[in-house]
Amino acid sequence: MSQDKKATLLSSEDAANQNFATDNQISGGCAKCGCEVLIHYHYDSGKPVPNAPFILIDSNKTEIHGKTDANGLCKIYDMGCGTFELMLDEGSDDFKPRETVENNPVLQSNPAYATLAGEYFTLFLLLRKQGLVTYDADDSSDRHVDVDGAGIFTSIPKEYRKSYDRFWELDKRINRGSRQLKQAINKIHHSLAAEVADKGGDDNAALMLFCEIALGFIPVVGQAMDVYSIGEWSWQSYQEPARLEDPLHIAEGALCAIGVIPGLGDALKVSGRAIIRALKVGTPKELQFAIRTIRSLSDGNLVKGLTKLRAELRNYGAQAKALLLKIHAALKQVLAESKLKNNWIVSLMKDSFSAMITSLEKLIAKYDSALAYIESKFNEFIGKVITRVSGSARPKGSIAKAAEAPKAPAHAESQAAKPATPKSDNSITKADDGKPTNAVSEKKRRTSSKETEDISAGSNKGEQPDHAPQQKKAGEEDNACKAGSDKCQGEGEPVDMATGYVVDWRTDVELTGLLPLSMKRYYRSGGERKPGLLGALWRTNWDMSLELENGIATLTDGELNQAVFVLPDEGAFSRAPSSPQWRLARQQGQLVLQHVDGLRYRFEHALGLQLCLSAIEDRAGNRIALLWDRAELCWIVLPDGRLVHVETQQRRIVKLTLCDEHRQPLKTLSSYQYDAQGHLLSVRAGEGRNFDYQYSPQGWLLRWSDLAHTWVEHEYDAAGRALRDRTAEGFWPGAFRYDDDAFTSHYHSGFGGVTTYVRDARNNILLRREPDGGEHRFEWVDNQLAAEIDPLGGRTEYQRNDWGQVTAVTLPDGSVHRYDYDDDGQLLAYTDPLGNAWHYSRNAQGLVETASDPEGRSWHHAYTTQGLLSAVNGPDGCEQRYHYNRRGLLERLEPGEAPAVTFFYDGHDRLTARHIAHEQGVQVRRWDYEGGRNTPSKVVYEDGSETRFGYDGEGNLTSVTDALGQRYLFRYGAFDNLLETTDPLGATVRYHYNAESEFAGVTNSQGQMWQYRFDTAGRLSEERHYDGRVYRYDYDVAGQLTRRTAPDGSRLEYGYDVGGRLSEIQACRADGASEGATTFTYDLSGRLLKAASPDAVVEYAYNRAGQVVSERVNGEEVRTGYDDGGQRSVVEGLLSSLSLGWQGGRLTTLSIGSHQPLTFSHTASGYEQRRSNGEGFALRHEWSATGLLSGQALDGVNGVLERRYQYDVLDCLTGITDSHWGEQAFRLNGAGQVTAERREQGRQRQARLFGYDSEQNLCEVSAIAPDGAGRLSAKNAAVQLSSGYDEAGRVTQRGGRQYQYDACGRLVSRRESRPGFRPQETRFEWDAQDRLVRVSLPDGARWRYGYDAFGRRVSKVREGQVPSAQAVARVAYRWDGDQLSGQTQYRVDGSVTRAVQWVYEPGSFRPLAQVEEQAGQTRLHYIVADLTGTARELCSETGEVHWRGEQGLWGPHREEKIPIPLRRYLGDAANEEVYCELRYQGQVYDAETGLYYNRHRYYDPELGQYISADPIGLAGGLRPQGYVHNPMEWVDPFGLVGCPLKDSPLGKNGVELERTVSKKGNVKVDTLFENSNDAKNWAAEKLGPGKTRMYDSNGKWIGWQNKTGDSVYWGHNDWGKGVGKSTYPHLNININGEKGHLFLRDKIINRGQWDDFSNAFK
């Protein structure tokens, strides 16, 4: 492994960013100059060079002597300000090169065996090349080596007759020999023959024979290339006899022999060759090149290391000489026998073989003098080991300033060539190319800087042979490689539209661990096939192989993708332009393939010229070994010691079994069956992974099916391309047509449209024409996407590095996003179009150690030796620690301020228990499983209650039975689509799907149907609601929504900027008149700057990390500041400014204006325990052991406020005991709705019964009065209210009120009739965006409402006459994001009558305080909110209750301001001027209508539902008008009821919106999160601790990827970008075989966008 060393001169910015500090400071003696520099001397692995002496000569010619500290640091101050020169010696650490181990004892210990084997393999390779012999691995065993010869009809060429006869003579001798000999011969057939055979591809039989005989004497298997170097040395000596007089040539021959000696032989060879070649030239460049070559062996003090190697030279030289003597004797014996018998050697080789033996004799004769020569060169070289650096000093104090502007960079004179431009062809990269010569070289781990120049040693082994012919050929072959399967654009079920081939991807096995193991398989109906572990048609990721031919290696991966490489020399690597994600390197003689994700693949088992995958490793050293025996995979060894037994028949896997360390079976992972042709017929791999297959004689997949309802059939043309699909339930009824001359394919979809694809000769899609004519164009360079042009002409360009990673993205608006990587493809920095940068420094394993955002905040990470995350430290000082079991599973989580969590697993790595160490005792949750299922059959909760789960054969959840015995049922159809759900009350809902198995509607329990229709491109075109009203949608050719037409004819028309972001919404009434335009403006980074609507202009400003620092609405600004941890700490611009203090992620203090701060204390579990201000107000919270709120009380005053909560075993609220309002008890039905409420207050008792229909609509409310004995009985119930509903679930009549709705389902009339009174009617008017804009009251008053671009109400104005000059004529509202932060009431003359500010608990809608300003006076009241976040009390700063309120269940709100005129008791409310308009979370009371404004809608407490339909449609649940099903537990702060999208809170795990089975058989999941932080945190947990890419939780996002290739990466933060669901702001995920989106709720900014978003999930 390369461990390059470098000296870095740190700029001030580098020093600050990397947190470097040292007490090792030396004065240069020039205080007048006062300049400084910070030296950081380290290896490329990141390890420091400790205690290294140095001399620095500054611009004053002053010599400054010093030594680095233990961290490789030293600061020089008061030095000359110009250029300086720095010379550094070696450090105090040790140089420890890897030692090779002897592992070839059978042949080495028996010269006769070695000689026999050498001649045997030479003949075998020569004859195999002529097609005359073939090794039969199937019939070979420890007792027999089986080789098949030419058939009786094959003529043996005359020149090969003696060779052929001699081979069979040797074959008999081997098979008559010992068992150990036959084992060794079989081993060589599979382990050594491939590269030696490839080297012998030039028909040089003499060289091949020489090498094969020598091979038998080599102690270290795997050194085949070193063997060849001995033979090649002899061949060169034969061709140029004069070279035998050159001491350098003789010395190189001696070193070739030393290199194969176990132990330090290889290190001596590498060092010796580098030294003598460098000293021969003698230039500083060559000397430094040699230093860097030797440095590739190890970190450490090179002088001490070379001294130790020099001392070993004589010992290893003697062993090598003895080895040469044995080889020489064997060669002489073979030659002597051949002369006597006039055999094949004489006929094929003539004099060349004899001459090579003569060259070897001369080497042996001069061997001792060669050792002396090498030793003298070691002595000469050791004195020249030094590192030189030149650079410029920094001004005084620079290092202490993190924001110092960049100065002139330090220039590193490393005596090597300056870095060259990275190569993009197949050439081998060497050290003097300026790039690491080892694909796993430990690269720069720190944030790159123009001011930091490294001295880096490569790992090249000196002069290299000319690879030009191979490079040319490899380039030609790689240029013919087709586009990879990851570029597949599929249609149907599924078909690759570039080729027309049916393709299929499946994952059969997934095992977690230190390095997770998966077995994935791939099928395609046409193209070249390569039989593998699953037979003739399917290929697995374990089938990855290298095919060698004349110095070229062709990689074929598990999906038949190919890449062509030149075989690299030792210490170098080569690239394949068409697959830049791979690099092929040679390390210690072995070929190693490295992927950009950091995984390394080794190939040590040979099948002829094919090398099979033998190991997978990560950067942390975790390794999966694949053990082969004579072409059959037998075992897979996992990093934790467990094994997978691979049972095969005819080299095909028939069973995979997980075994423990002692090879005892634990679990059958999968089993396979085949037909006589080797075609895979069935797979049994556990729930959801069981399939049966049928094929045509040509191997075309005709049908596959699972064990449930899903099947797919294909028809083909003569070329194996799909013509038509047929599937269960008629999904994907597509047809395919091809125009080969035009490289064009057509897909006729089930929607009636035709999608056309045009490809290039390499199967890259150049054009995709949608059914509506829109054309997407793509440009490719070496199979890498270089640009794409959308149908509107917007061009996006991609720049890439040598790894194929995108380094710059230029969007259609010209903005550029930049990504910086180190030499191994690890992200170092991201820079947004405004120049803000996020930096990442990494450890030797490539894992992020520090992530820093543009605001200077840093997150620090520590890891175990296995590369698992062990600790995270945030910029606020919070630390979270992780501990793992031996299998790499999380065993203990210590989340800083919260209790530790311990996890337990069974032998199948399934979670079985979780212990949380609460202060009330350990809380235990358990999971039980049935058989081998990975999904739990039962969960036992902390209180002992249980929930049971049932599944079908495909692993779909079919039933849930809760602790009360209530059962929920689920039924599925083809492709695991959910068809029916039945709740415990028997209500059944049915779901419908379109032609491509996407959700297309629902039939509710009452038979009403909500339907979606789609256009020819598969886009939602029509939405038909329960009542028959229809919304229609139109799109442009780029797939962007351009128009929504409502049932009444009103329209919303959408416009987009060049970047695809929503830029304008035009609202038009049914008569065509415009209601005005809403416009959106963005900055270069895509962040919203301005949203202007007819009623409001909203403007935003951001800090460098992208956090909002200013929100201005109609000129009124709310300013936000953040602390070091990124938490909101200051809010200004409101009535009273807010100051927030945080500790460990918890709110600890809150200051409101100049009032005494509130302080907060928390339980060990993180729940709020107490809040107080030190002046009398103190609110205490009590929590159950399972985290349920059990009580609230005001401390210090008995009885003034105490509230307690009771729950059932399902944690549902069943009772409230309130010191003021009395006691409440609730009874719930199977749907979780309250069916009975009993209240007791003193001696007063009453009860109510609630009746619902199957759609959970409240139909009837009955009251129960106590009988004479005070008892409450249901038989005494009397109906109070009954409601009538229409087919859409809207209330049409309730009591004496009638309700009418318009064509869009919005309330337009509320008419109340009372006997003896004139009917009272309230009229409601709406705009095209479904916003209530005007109310006309029965008394003639009219109120008009205004909104901003996001649907937030910003004003309420009374139109016409007002009753008095003191009456409120206008109300203005203030917003802080989605929180209604206040309102100001104005009189007719514009004077303020009352201003209110509401303060909420951070990140929620739970009110915390109310600030009022009236008549110049400001007063503060603290709000006490109940379980659901409803304001219940207003308390003064001294703790007195001044107001009480209670929201009735399905009824009106009641309040108490001042119960008696004179305050007598502290518990009595006082001061009738104090009141609170807040209701349920997110709601504010409108006195004029009695409605509650609820952000996106208006809630009518009398109806218990909203007065307009949910703007997000069915995404809000099956009751578009309904409020939550149980307001005693659930809230809807956004007015998007029931909708998992908008129920508050979403929770840290988000809410799953949709789960489907993709056409490839993988699961696709879309989830909604509150914001990107929550989404990232959730994703980080899913990916596990072994992530190699990550971003901090407060800045821009790039992505994470773990060791298995699972990933989470940023989609976009903009609106209207992408196609389909990808148009909405999201992250992308690919985790555990599940792909999908993580949508961000806070980026969906207005009602129109909610409509669009909702429609995407219908």
Swiss-Prot record:
UniProt keyword annotation of Plastid present: no
Free-text disruption phenotype from the record: A double rhsC-rhsIC deletion is not outcompeted by wild-type cells.
YD repeats: 821-857, 939-966, 1014-1050, 1326-1355
Biased composition (Basic and acidic residues): 473-490
Record carries keyword Nuclease: yes
GO molecular function, one term: nuclease activity
Low complexity composition-biased segments: 400-413
Ranges for region Disordered: 393-494
Its EC number(s): 3.1.-.-
Domain of life: Bacteria
Homology family: Belongs to the RHS/WapA nuclease family.
Name of this chain's protein: Putative deoxyribonuclease RhsC
Natural source organism: Dickeya dadantii (strain 3937) (Erwinia chrysanthemi (strain 3937))
Gene name of this polypeptide: rhsC
